[in-house]
């Protein structure tokens, strides 16, 4: 993927979806299959970028795409949308406000799950 192709939107890059600290630590290949790229683009263009603009605060992708092996090792659901490029776990300073903004924005989404103790929000399209 060329450098220009890595930027998905003004606020999100493809490499944010691929990076995994656990994959690096364990030496796992979390390479992105070409068939999930359209789903990642859809998630970013239709949900994440509009939400980021509405929220007006940084949102950081903690977990994006996961290979089947990585998903298993992190304890993800066997049918996790992360493996399809349809979900992200994000961090933002004010998670409650982000959820309020998500509802107020009227954006279409599948799931929004607040993990209070882990400090992130799972979003899927």
Q: What residues fall within each predicted segment?
A:
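Glycine-rich, flexible loop/turn motifs
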Residues: 4, 70, 79
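Extracytoplasmic cell-surface/polysaccharide-interacting catalytic and binding patches
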Residues: 1-54, 118
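Detector for Asparagine
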Residues: 29-30, 42, 71, 96, ...
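Extended, low-complexity, intrinsically disordered C-terminal regulatory tails
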Residues: 45-75
